């Protein structure tokens, strides 16, 4: 089946989308004023999935929400060449959250951005735009895309050249002096404050290896949530003098970390792959 491009399906729903965006934008600006936010961090990723951030003052946010923030894309690996360098970071107001780890005396917020060309077209090097385009193509033929990842990572005592694990535990193990378990608990509280629901977390099979499983949601929101989770895990570990890493194989002879991702397509609120005539569904 040929799936239409995004541009073939937006005409009828564009006014509703613009109205929804304006309502979300108004909510963001009102929240910033009411909560006394002093700094807003604009987040996006490069083509390798590295987290990028630009900080602006609340006074600049309304203009940036309307017009985007222009920056030199050639300074970011894989984005653009010098001769065609300028791109726009356009905040998605639906992703705004207050940062729970910010100094209470100086509240900060964060918002994910789409990267576009100066003419407003999608920038091909922006992973979020690539995902959005494919989500829209699936929606055009009646499908909603959902996913739920199992995020695995290691905690080490420091960031030195020889990794030192915090424990010798294995799958589902728990000890009364489990420092890493406490780090996971703090991370879950942080994710809850960021409106990211967690299904469960536990010690994985390898020493000092852990897993956090997020509750399934739409693919674009989940991509943002995974980026936020990675930052939260590292931030909380760093505050305790511990080093967290998501690299796939940090220890020789020990199973590595992955991110199993459960994908599903729904049509009219029903699982498109469910077959009630089959015993196993």
Pin down the residues of each PLM region.
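Glycine-rich, acidic/polar active-site loops that bind/position phosphate-bearing ligands
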Residues: 2-281
